[in-house]
A protein has these predicted regions:
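Short, glycine-rich nucleotide/cofactor-binding loops
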Residues: 18-30
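Residues at the starts of beta-strands that form the adenosine-phosphate
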Residues: 17, 43-46, 125
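Structural beta-sheet core signal
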Residues: 20, 47-49, 128
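Conserved acidic residues
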Residues: 9, 43, 96
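Short, surface-exposed acidic-centric catalytic microdomains
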Residues: 32-86
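Classical nucleotidyltransferase
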Residues: 13, 66, 83-171
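Single conserved hydrophobic/aromatic residue that forms the stacking wall/gate
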Residues: 1-12
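Residue-level signal for inorganic ion chemistry
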Residues: 28, 69, 150
Length: 171
């Protein structure tokens, strides 16, 4: 990847199609920040929900996650699903780069081997974007735990997602 600075914006040449993969159960404001920043850097961005649709795990189904993401991002951003190897999806769809957010060195330690494996399997690069510090403490798991016990999740999820999370835990 050949980054260059143009004004205050970072441009990545020859990388037009990007995928932001994750389970997004559910999507948080930290995720949205990374997705929006990727959308400024690349010509086409797809948020890719990963997992197995036949094995309900987590708080939201795959369809619910995709709907919540669509409600939370710019209409120009695509939302799709993948239950197989990420590199198979990226090869089939002509994706140039993966985008992942990093909150801390722990995220880096977790994401680096996956990025290296993806590169080994298909040659695809992964771009790591540092999470805005105001979202550094936010993870889907922690936020769900707060919501489960009736805590205030304001500022953790997009509004529609926050309402959906609260509704899930009312049941």
């Amino acid at each position: 990847i050949m980054p260059s600075l143009v004004g205050s914006e970072m441009c990545i040449r020859d990388r037009t199609k990007a995928v932001c993969p994750g389970s997004f159960d559910p999507v948080t404001l930290g995720h949205i920040d990374i997705i929006n920043r990727a959308n400024q850097m690349f010509d086409e961005v797809t948020v890719l929900v990963t997992g197995n649709p036949d094995k309900p795990s987590g708080l939201f189904s795959v369809d619910e996650r995709m709907k919540l993401i669509r409600q939370s991002v710019d209409p120009s951003i695509k939302v799709d699903f993948c239950s197989g190897l990420l590199v198979d999806y990226t090869t089939h769809h002509g994706v140039d780069v993966l985008v992942k957010g990093l909150r801390s060195s722990l995220d880096y330690e977790y994401e680096l081997p996956m990025a290296q494996m993806n590169r080994h399997l298909s040659g695809i690069d992964t771009v790591f974007l540092l999470t805005d510090e105001k979202y550094g403490y936010i993870s889907s798991s922690l936020c769900k735990q707060v919501a489960k016990f009736g805590g205030d999740v304001t500022g953790m999820f997009p509004d529609a997602v926050g309402r959906a999370v609260k509704e899930k835990y009312r049941k």
